[in-house]
């Protein structure tokens, strides 16, 4: 059976090579060719013996998911639509800044968590992405951005904040994270990789044990009553449990703070009283807040909080000593802003709000 080498992290690739009677250093060579150099053709791996190249051609492929479209925003943001098969596509976003280049990666085709303010959840859920489909987004973005030639690192940061809940696809997300960290692959620092979660408490503990990277928690409400409505997973893992999990994660995290993501919804969660409730909620967790202006999508009942309200809300948090930033909306002209990623999902598990765009239309 032919295997896709993009599905292997360093450890599993070494094990597969051993099964083929090859030494560990050969696996490292191939890993460097695939991920550092972005090479998919075994014949182009010139420092590998011809006999091994022939063996690889017979037993393996390097098959990243295809890029269906590549849209460039007026602000330099790029959104890639990635074909993951069976009529499904996911979205990957590159956000350039003066001091960094951040790639936002998807981990699922759709999302089952159905957060009230997020268009991905309204598309429904199909399936988890494979390791190749997750790391393949980074592989393809490096090619599109010209980052596979020369020493300059175009993508300096990766965030698992695209479509889906990374911790609901734990095994494949962690394998992809390990490739990002591997010096023979992408060589990123743990501090420069962020996993975003809506609060799957037991799996947060697993991440801390197995692959601690920077953590962002989609908080969005200061109390259980409101969060139950906005982030339904809260009904299973309420805020008291979530805050305790954040404290445990900090014992293993590469950064000494948790980032709390907080979407600003006009008249819903943006009052002074909400800000004061937040201060009481997070008093035992060393944290930063990232306030996110709501990005509208068809069928949503919410409105973006006025800019002055967002500034005042941030001031309350900062006056209490909490570092608080307001995310600059990027890529909204190409629907690449936070909460707008919808891709194309053939939903088999629950109803879908709005129309799902077939890939044949997306390509046109």
UniProtKB/Swiss-Prot annotation:
It holds the Pfam family Radical_SAM. It is found in: Cytoplasm. Disulfide bonds join 104-338. One of its GO terms (cellular component) is cytoplasm. SMART domains: Elp3 (SM00729). The active site is at 91 (proton acceptor), 338 (s-methylcysteine intermediate). Its cofactor is [4Fe-4S] cluster. PROSITE patterns: RADICAL_SAM. GO terms for molecular function: 4 iron, 4 sulfur cluster binding; metal ion binding; rRNA (adenine(2503)-C2-)-methyltransferase activity; rRNA binding; tRNA (adenine(37)-C2)-methyltransferase activity; tRNA binding. The keyword Cell inner membrane does not apply. It catalyses: adenosine(2503) in 23S rRNA + 2 reduced [2Fe-2S]-[ferredoxin] + 2 S-adenosyl-L-methionine = 2-methyladenosine(2503) in 23S rRNA + 5'-deoxyadenosine + L-methionine + 2 oxidized [2Fe-2S]-[ferredoxin] + S-adenosyl-L-homocysteine; adenosine(37) in tRNA + 2 reduced [2Fe-2S]-[ferredoxin] + 2 S-adenosyl-L-methionine = 2-methyladenosine(37) in tRNA + 5'-deoxyadenosine + L-methionine + 2 oxidized [2Fe-2S]-[ferredoxin] + S-adenosyl-L-homocysteine. Specifically methylates position 2 of adenine 2503 in 23S rRNA and position 2 of adenine 37 in tRNAs. m2A2503 modification seems to play a crucial role in the proofreading step occurring at the peptidyl transferase center and thus would serve to optimize ribosomal fidelity. PANTHER family: 23S RRNA METHYLTRANSFERASE, RADICAL SAM CORE DOMAIN-CONTAINING PROTEIN. Reaction proceeds by a ping-pong mechanism involving intermediate methylation of a conserved cysteine residue. This is Dual-specificity RNA methyltransferase RlmN. It comes from Dechloromonas aromatica (strain RCB). The lineage of its organism: Bacteria, Pseudomonadati, Pseudomonadota, Betaproteobacteria, Rhodocyclales.
């Amino acid at each position: 059976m032919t295997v896709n080498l993009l599905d292997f992290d360093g450890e599993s690739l070494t094990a597969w090579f051993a099964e083929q009677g090859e030494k560990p250093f050969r696996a490292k060579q191939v890993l460097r060719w695939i991920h550092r150099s972005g090479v998919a053709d075994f014949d182009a791996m010139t420092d590998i013996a011809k006999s091994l190249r022939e063996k690889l051609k017979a037993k393996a492929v390097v098959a990243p998911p295809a890029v269906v479209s590549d849209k460039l925003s007026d602000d330099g943001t790029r959104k890639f639509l990635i074909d993951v098969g069976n009529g499904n596509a996911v979205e990957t976003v590159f956000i350039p800044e003066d001091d960094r280049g951040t790639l936002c990666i998807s981990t699922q085709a759709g999302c089952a968590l159905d957060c009230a303010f997020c268009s991905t959840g309204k598309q429904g859920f199909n399936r988890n992405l494979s390791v190749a489909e997750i790391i393949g987004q980074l592989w393809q973005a490096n090619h599109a951005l010209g980052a596979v030639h020369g020493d300059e690192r175009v993508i300096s940061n990766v965030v698992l904040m695209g479509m889906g809940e990374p911790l609901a696809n734990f095994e494949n997300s962690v394998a992809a994270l390990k490739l990002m960290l591997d010096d023979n692959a992408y060589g990123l620092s743990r501090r420069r990789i962020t996993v975003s979660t809506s609060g799957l408490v037991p799996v947060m503990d697993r991440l801390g044990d197995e692959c601690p990277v920077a953590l962002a928690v989609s908080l969005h409400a200061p109390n259980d009553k409101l969060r139950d409505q906005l982030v339904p997973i809260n009904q299973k893992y309420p805020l008291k449990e979530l805050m305790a999990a954040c404290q445990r994660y900090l014992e293993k995290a590469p950064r000494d703070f948790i980032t709390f993501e907080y979407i600003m919804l006009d008249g819903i969660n943006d009052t002074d009283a909400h800000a004061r409730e937040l201060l009481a909620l997070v008093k035992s967790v060393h944290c930063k807040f990232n306030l996110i202006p709501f990005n509208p999508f068809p069928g949503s009942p919410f409105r973006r909080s006025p800019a002055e309200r967002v500034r005042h809300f941030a001031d309350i948090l900062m006056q209490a000593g909490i570092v608080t930033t307001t995310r600059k909306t990027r890529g909204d002209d190409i629907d690449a802003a936070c909460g707008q990623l919808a891709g194309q999902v053939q939903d088999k598990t629950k109803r879908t709000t709005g129309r799902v765009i077939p890939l044949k239309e997306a390509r046109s």
